[in-house]
Amino acid sequence: MKPVFTHCAFHVRDLERSVAFYREFCGLKIVEEHGEGPNDHAVWMTEDGREGEYVFVLLLGGLGHQQRDADLSHFGFAVGSKSEVDEVAHRGQAAGMLAWPPKAFPFPVGYRCALRDPDGYLVEFSYGQPLGPGAET
């Protein structure tokens, strides 16, 4: 069998804040939670309908994420329209989390913005990339 990408696991300082961020801004829901101690508590989150395909695994015990401005490493989420990118950016700015304001780029980047999650990870929201909603435009 060919390997299949199933999850991305990363440490977070405050599990409750991180779960709230990914629920509010990315629409993810908890599908699994296990562990009890401060170093073994994990929460699995995914999108509706993708429970058996791909999950984010949030692991308690992170130190925070330091990322240089020139480092474009990020988690990417597609949204259904440019106005949805603008709406995420507006809510992110109000919460003090906006890292990249909305901007249009040539294909394949599309229209995008990014927020910093509670640990400092960049989370991109895009429309018009060749993946997800807007891929056909």
Where does each model-flagged region fall?
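Alpha-helical elements of the RecA-like P-loop NTPase motor core of helicases
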Residues: V19-A20, D86, V123-E124
